[in-house]
Amino acid sequence: MATLFSKIAAGEIPSYKCAESDKFYAFLDINPVVKGHTLVVPRKEVDYIFDMDDQDLADFEVFAKKVARAIRAAYPCRKVAEVVLGLEVNHAHIHLLPINSEADVDFHKHVKLSDEEMKTTAKNIYEAFKKL
């Protein structure tokens, strides 16, 4: 059975798309820790990131790097944090969070954004990604 993230990447479940390639898909987290909190997933279903084959993992990180640059271009910040947890959905994924301090990486806190804010955020990241 397809995972939640596979369905999102395939367009079966709506998402706030930030970037995509033939192998990877990036979209806003619907329960963001900070504005611009983006999830990056491989289209190929793999439960655990470190079970990915070496080349796929390398390509995944390069794609995530490009998404991080787009996030930073759209929403200037000191850094874009990369977090791998992988317990909530059984599909490898990377959290990218624009941060200005370590306190910004607190998964117990969330920001509420309207649908319009989410659409605008995704569009801004998507447009920045296309320019890279």
Which residues fall in each region the model found?
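HIT superfamily nucleotide-processing domains
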Residues: M1-L132
